[in-house]
């Protein structure tokens, strides 16, 4: 195994976590890495920290750019990446030591286009030897088989950082310029291009669950990008009867989540009718008896209440 892996790290306001993140990549047991740190106009000490790391390790390259968001930061790095394989790490997370060795080994042994693993999620840092020791399994399957889960928005299939992509498969593929959920459409199109994938149950990545991160902070205008991300998939599958029902489900899930966030935070309520309209466009698909996807009775009840009595829906959501 001597393939070059390009590891892309967007960096913005992660000063507290950046050293741990980069150190974990530098310390990988697989050494043939191109580490691209993209300083997305971070206003703290991150730019200087990135430069300091580049001086310590010749495998590290730093891109300094104006702040345009994580999607553009990743796209900028993708356009310059030289690796045979591509990986992504978020600046506030870190990798366990064998991550890229094992992802690449699985990719080569199974002869697949995308290799993915499980991950450990917490707000408390752990070391690899503290993880539960379970027998490692690697399952090879057609990428087409997991497209329903991608369309629905299954988290493990939607994120970037637990995967290794063959560069030739994702060549020219970019993320839409969204503030959140931009990785879901990227993965959707990557899986559409891929032939075979490998899925390991081994926890190789530490995902830091912190309340101030982009994905977990309080409801804000960028949260509506979750709907835009699903809309991209919905439009792509509108003429595909096999996947369109799953794309609808993912779109409805996103709209209901955004609507609940709006109501709970009492923010952007001027857009309530807009999001409600998004949902009601697909009430027939959810409420009819014979559907490709069987929705839970609880979800059907939410749809009916939102349709017939939006004021009651708001009161129930606020309880």
Question: Residue locations for each model-derived region?
Answer:
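Acidic helix N-cap motif at the loop->helix transition within catalytic regions
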Residues: 19, 33, 44-52, 94, ...
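A conserved acidic beta->alpha catalytic loop
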Residues: 24, 31, 39-48, 66, ...
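Catalytic core of nucleotide-sugar-dependent glycosyltransferases
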Residues: 204-210, 216-242, 257-286
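Membrane-interface aromatic/basic loop that binds lipid-linked glycans or pyrophosphate carriers
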Residues: 264-319
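Short aromatic/hydrophobic "clamp" motif used to bind/position activated sugar donors
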Residues: 86
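Glycine-rich, basic loop-to-helix element that forms the pyrophosphate-binding segment
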Residues: 65-81
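N-proximal low-complexity "stem/linker" segments adjacent to membrane-targeting elements
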Residues: 1-26
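Donor-binding/catalytic cores of nucleotide-activated saccharide
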Residues: 91-197, 208-221
């Amino acid at each position: 195994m001597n393939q070059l892996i390009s590891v892309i790290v967007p960096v913005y306001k992660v000063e507290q976590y950046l050293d741990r993140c980069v150190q974990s990549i530098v310390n990988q047991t697989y050494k043939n890495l191109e580490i691209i740190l993209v300083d997305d106009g971070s206003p703290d000490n991150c730019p200087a920290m990135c430069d300091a790391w580049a001086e310590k390790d010749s495998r590290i390259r730093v891109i300094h750019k104006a702040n345009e968001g994580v999607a553009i930061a990743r796209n900028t790095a993708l356009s310059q990446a030289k690796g045979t394989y591509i990986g992504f790490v978020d600046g506030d997370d870190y990798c366990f030591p064998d991550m890229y060795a094992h992802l690449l080994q699985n990719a080569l042994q199974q002869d697949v286009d995308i290799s993915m693993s499980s991950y450990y999620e917490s707000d408390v840092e752990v070391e690899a030897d503290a993880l539960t020791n379970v027998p490692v399994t690697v399952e090879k399957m057609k990428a087409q088989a997991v497209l329903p889960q991608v369309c629905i928005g299954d988290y493990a299939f939607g994120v970037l950082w637990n995967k290794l992509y063959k560069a030739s498969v994702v060549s020219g593929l970019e993320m839409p310029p969204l503030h959140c959920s931009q990785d879901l459409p990227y993965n959707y199109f990557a899986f559409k291009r891929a032939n075979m994938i490998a899925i390991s149950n081994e926890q190789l990545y530490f995902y830091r669950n912190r309340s101030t991160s982009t994905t977990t902070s309080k409801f804000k205008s960028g949260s509506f990008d979750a709907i835009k991300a699903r809309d991209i998939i919905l439009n792509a599958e509108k003429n595909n009867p096999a996947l369109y029902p799953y794309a609808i489900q993912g779109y409805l899930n996103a709209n209901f989540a955004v609507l609940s966030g709006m109501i709970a935070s009492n923010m952007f309520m001027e857009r309530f009718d807009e999001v409600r309209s998004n949902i009601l466009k697909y009430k027939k698909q959810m409420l009819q008896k014979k559907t490709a996807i069987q929705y839970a009775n609880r979800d059907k009840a939410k749809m009916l209440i939102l349709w017939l009595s939006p004021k009651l829906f708001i009161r129930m959501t606020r309880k």
